[in-house]
Amino acid sequence: MGRAGCRNYGIGIMKLTGLLFFFLVTTIGLNAQNIVFVYENKVYQSNIKTVQCFNTKKEQSVPIYTLKSAETLTFNFDDLKGGNRGYSYTVEHCTSSWKPSKINSIDYLESFNEDIITNYRYSFNTLQKFTHYEIKLPNEQIKPKIAGNYILKVYENANKSRPIISQRFYVLDPVINVGAEIVASSDVANRYKIQKVNFTIFHQMPIQNPYLDIKAIVTQNNNPNGAILNTKPTFIKPGSLVYNELNANEFWGGNEYRKFDTRSFRYKAEHVQDIYVDTINTAVLFNDVNSSGPKYSNQFDENGNFFIRNQDGRNPSTDSDYAKVIFSLNAIPPNEKGSIHVLGQFNNYSIAPANKMVYDENRKKYFANLKLKQGLYDYKYIWLSEDGKIDDTFFEGSFFETDNSYQVFVYYRKPGGRWEELIGFSNVSSLKK
């Protein structure tokens, strides 16, 4: 090849390289722009792990605090990329159905409307390096002044178009009381499988139209999936609203959660079959089977929660390492058109490709591989049908005796008001203790 040919060939390579670079940059830019923010508990980047939000008084409690009190929320997460990536955050007031209230921040904040996360620490003596971030709410920079639902938004480099985390929390102004109880269903066929929630709102405030001004939402184990909305009280009495309609607020009791213990990688604790240590820790769990038998078996669980713990170090937040946790399920699905997922509070009960199980034809089992921080974990298996319906009883069973916690949130919108406020809350166990 002559000099001219070499020169033309080199120019062609440079043009091709330039086009590839342009395509790569454009693709990355489009992907960043295509991130859709949602008003639910969600992680938007795979390097973000172990998101927690709870009332500081009790770890993994419902993320709710009382307005104008000394209570705070603790919110934290890990970034597996390490370093300090300059995360900022803001909060936004929402409706009872978790949609934007569409009011100005000066209506719901008595402070600034955004801040930088300055409290962070680096992991110590771990194979998986990470940075641990934490904030307390409310604080001097972010301080809600009205009750209601709020969404916490974390984003990178002060760019709100690049969301990192969205996290729901609640601010309560307890002007009413809520009494709740768990009873058997009137449905004879399923009364040994279903738990029914009856509740009463006790108030001294004037409520002009309970059908329009009051909404009550009931959840099981602080799981937003399957939340039930109540807009019509069964009985309206002086000073109280009664919600005990037949077949209303009924939940499958489910079963006690499965669990495992990875507080140490030096020995095999509960439900851990093997531990391997290489460039990263690997914990292989014992094989699981279908638990939907005819009889209830009592065992202690944490109602789907998880707790970061570490017996190999001192500080659970920074000394707890990560591991690839291998789940396996030997069970026959209801049909071939659907998928099995591993869910718990550790992944917000959210169905995603990361927690989908894959069938191994050679071993005749379903497997999932999740990267999780050391600790105590509850989990369960659910079936997602082809039409998007969730069945969390097929692999687990359902029993009235199962211990579950139920949350009742009561919202009030003043006549002519522009937003809803959270005025009542109750957290009740299905077991009488």
What annotation goes with each model-predicted range?
Residues 1-35:
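Bacterial Sec-dependent N-terminal signal peptides
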Residues 33-66, 173-188, 301-314:
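Short, compositionally biased P/S/T/A/G/V-rich stretches that sit at domain boundaries
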Residues 36-38, 171-192, 399-423:
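Low-complexity, Pro/Ser/Thr- and charge-rich linker/hinge segments at domain boundaries
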Residues 44-93, 189-201, 314-327:
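Contiguous beta-strand segments within globular domains
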Residues 96-98, 142, 156-162, 223, ...:
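Short acidic/polar inter-strand loop motif in beta-rich domains
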Residues 110-133, 225-233, 326-374, 386-413:
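Aromatic-rich carbohydrate-binding modules that target alpha-glucans
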Residues 129-142, 147-157:
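Ligand-binding face of N-terminal immunoglobulin V-set domains in extracellular IgSF glycoproteins
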Residues 284-336, 422-433:
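Basic K/R-rich, polyanion-interacting modules in nucleoproteins and related proteins
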